[in-house]
Amino acid sequence: MAKLPQVPFGAVYFRKSNPPQQDWERDYKTAAEDGLNVFRHWFMWSAIERAPGKFDWDDYDRQLDLAAKHGIVTIIAELSQTTPDWAVRKFADARQVLYDGRVHPSIQSPSSATGGFSHSGGGTGTLTLNAPEVRAAAQNFLTTMARRYKGHPALLGYDVWNECNYSPYTDYGPYTVAAFRDWLKRKYGTLDDLARAWHRYSYAEWDDIEPPTQFMPYCECLDWLRFKQDNHYEQMQFRIDAIRAADPDAMIVAHGTAGSVTQLAQRGSDDWRAASKVETYGYTWVSARKGTEPWKNFFAADLVRGAARGKSFWHAERQGGPLWMQPQVLGRDKDDGRVATPEDIRLWSLSSFAGGARGMMNLRFRPLLDGPLFGAFGSYDMAGHRTPRSDMAASIARWANAQKQADLMKAAPVTGDIGIIMAPEAQGFAFLLNYNGKFDTYSAAMWGAYRGFFDNNIQADWVHIDDIEGRNILYFPYPIMLLPDQAEKITNWVRAGGVLICEACPGYFGPGGRAGTKQPN
């Protein structure tokens, strides 16, 4: 088992279709010479189990052996959501279904010219893990993989969810619908209790219940969103358990998109929940997609530091090169993160370290050679040669891992001057309330508060509503919905001496999305 470096600093490297095999040895040598000490690779089920029970590990074995040779540690990103084509045929009844009845096809990814992906987002594939046969097949893949690489001198651990998210529009297939009904039984107990909560009075059997296909601020929609979160985080735990059963010593990591403020309700991007399940958490933050305003350089690290609740966290995907031909860059100046410079890489890296990140990976060691993201993000050039950008990254890697920086890298940011409350229920209800109008009220309020403090040199921490004890001053943006226990928690905190600065309409809506007949609710 490999040892964790002082500061894991490296890149995502192997995705089966890229980079070319003839360059692997040279690339590893270059990376090691430049001070890079960690690679993450995509171990795609669809590329490895080529027929039932017939695994092709050759290319993956080579990655770990090269890593051991050159002193680089390896994070295996398990991509069990990339479904083998034979499994799509064999388990056709388990294909995920969109809200309009269309089934998910098996496609190639924009980030890998390899089959088995789906349109359904970062955490789910063509088939649902709610189907027992699919889950058993995925578990067999995970178990076989973990047993194979257990104890390898280059193995550091496993990334069990890439960019923790899923599609807002799935899954309406029979296995997930059945799981939803079971979830409702556990929550409500009887059909009568569910009928009162949902205002649907003609359910004769549990099988009459179908998940909602609209996004509206009603109890059934809130329940559907919550079920999907519970369901996918249970699937995350399933992957963790499968790997740990085969290799208890492997490090377990995951990374999201710092998306709790913008994507929690619809895509399940709950950084707090994801971080709670792993030893080290991380985040993807690409300035070419997000923008390079000063406050944005710190936002993701600050949010994930709060979500990590004291655990180590990494900037797991940091931009190292240009981006073009993508919707996020339209209408933006090329200097707005689109064409990364060495100085950009220095700024982005040091901002993340200042925010508390203690590991860093470029999301490409070198650019892809095919697909819509060809040529994007790599610090090294299309052939894997050094560039001024890679030289800058190398200098940061060496600096961060120098012995004289050991104490610095053990340090952490001080507690902020003020905490910004993150309330998942408020975010979820705001998403449903504003969906048809296409308003981004919640994220605008949260970002506005953070930016206001940042621009006035006030350090603001992100604080989950469950974590307010121990804070002195809190700011609560757009607190439109609260559960009774949350309202009681905040009330007791204020009575105990806490200072709360609260925007309008705190808890205006309560359980089930129902407005109070008097306010404050």
Task: Please tell me what each predicted stretch does.
Residues 9-20, 42-58, 118-139, 163-169, ...:
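The substrate-binding groove and active-site-proximal loops of carbohydrate-active enzymes
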